[in-house]
A protein has these predicted regions:
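Alpha-helical transmembrane segments and their immediate juxtamembrane cytosolic regions
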Residues: 1-266
Length: 266
C-alpha cells in the first residue's frame, strides 16, 4: 500500500502530464493556421488534458480533510478576469474550464468527502449519460455565443445575453456541466475507493485485479468510441476531440486515467 504522500506525488506527475498536453493543445490554436487540420495524434493527445484535470479535481476533493466549497467562487472569479483581461469578452458566458472547475468544487466538495464511492460513481455516470442524451436530442450548438468587450459597438440586449447562459452552462459551452461535472464525481469515486478510505481494498492481488479491470475497461470503451467515432471539426481554432464530448470519448478518457492510476499504484 502506498502512503498518502506517495499518492500525492503520483497525482502531481499526472497533473504535470496534463499541463504539458494542455499547453500543446492550446498553443496549437495560435501556432497552426486556423483553417488547416491539425495532426490527428496531437488532437488525440490534447484531448486527454481536460478530463485528467477534472478527474484529479474530484480526487483532491475526496482527499480533503475539510470540504471548502467556497473556494470554487474564487476560481470562477479568476475565470471571469481571464475572459475580460485576456480574451476581452463578456465573462460568465462561454464557460471555459475555470468556471466549470469552480462550479464543480462548490457542488461536489461535501459529496466527495462523505458519499460512498458507489453513490459518487453512479451519479458521475448519470451526468455523462445526460450529456450524451442532450447531444442526441439536438440541443448541442457547435457555434458559441460570445460578446466582445468592444466599447465602440453596443452590447446585445440583456435578454439576448441571458437567454444563452443556461444552454452554454449546461450543454454546449466550452466545458458544460453535462458531462464535465461527471468527471469530477467519478474522480471523487476513484479516490473514495483507494485504500485510504477502504482499508479492506489492499494487497498485491487487489492491485493486480484493478490493473486488469482498467485494461478491460480501456479496450471496451476505446472500441465503442472507435465504432461511433466521427472526426469533429475544430472549434474556433481548438482541435481537441471533445466538441462535443460524446459518451465514447468520455468513457475512453476515464479508462485511460484509471489505467494510469492503476499503473502508479500497482
Amino acid at each position: 500500500m502506498h502512503s498518502a504522500q506517495n499518492r500525492i506525488v503520483q497525482y502531481d506527475i499526472l497533473s504535470g502530464i496534463a499541463i504539458s498536453l494542455m499547453l500543446m493543445a492550446n498553443s496549437a490554436a495560435t501556432v497552426f493556421i486556423a483553417d488547416k487540420p491539425h495532426p490527428f495524434l496531437m488532437r488525440l493527445a490534447g484531448s486527454f488534458a481536460a478530463p485528467t484535470f477534472m478527474l484529479l479535481a474530484g480526487m483532491m476533493l475526496g482527499l480533503a480533510k475539510k470540504p471548502k466549497p467556497l473556494r470554487g467562487l474564487s476560481i470562477m472569479a479568476v475565470g471571469g478576469l481571464v475572459d475580460m483581461a485576456v480574451w476581452q469578452s463578456l465573462p460568465f458566458l462561454t464557460f471555459d474550464v475555470l468556471y466549470t472547475i469552480g462550479l464543480t468544487i462548490i457542488v461536489t466538495a461535501y459529496p466527495a468527502r462523505y458519499f460512498s464511492a458507489t453513490a459518487l460513481a453512479l451519479t458521475g455516470f448519470a451526468l455523462l449519460l445526460c450529456g450524451q442524451l442532450l447531444q442526441w436530442g439536438g440541443l448541442y450548438h457547435f457555434e458559441l455565443f460570445s460578446v466582445a468587450l468592444n466599447f465602440d459597438q453596443p452590447l446585445p440586449s440583456a435578454q439576448e445575453i441571458l437567454s444563452h447562459i443556461p444552454r452554454q452552462l449546461f450543454i454546449d459551452g466550452w466545458f458544460p456541466v453535462f458531462p464535465w461535472l461527471g468527471f469530477v464525481w467519478l474522480g471523487a469515486a476513484l479516490q473514495r475507493g483507494l485504500p485510504l478510505f477502504a482499508p479492506e481494498a489492499q494487497g498485491a492481488g487487489v492491485s493486480l485485479r484493478r490493473g486488469w479491470y482498467a485494461v478491460l475497461l480501456l479496450l471496451a470503451s476505446s472500441g465503442y468510441w472507435a465504432m461511433t467515432f466521427n472526426l469533429p471539426p475544430m472549434r474556433d481554432g481548438y482541435s481537441e476531440l471533445f466538441y462535443p464530448p460524446g459518451l465514447g470519448y468520455c468513457l475512453t478518457a476515464i479508462s485511460v486515467f484509471s489505467y494510469c492510476c492503476s499503473s502508479c499504484n500497482g
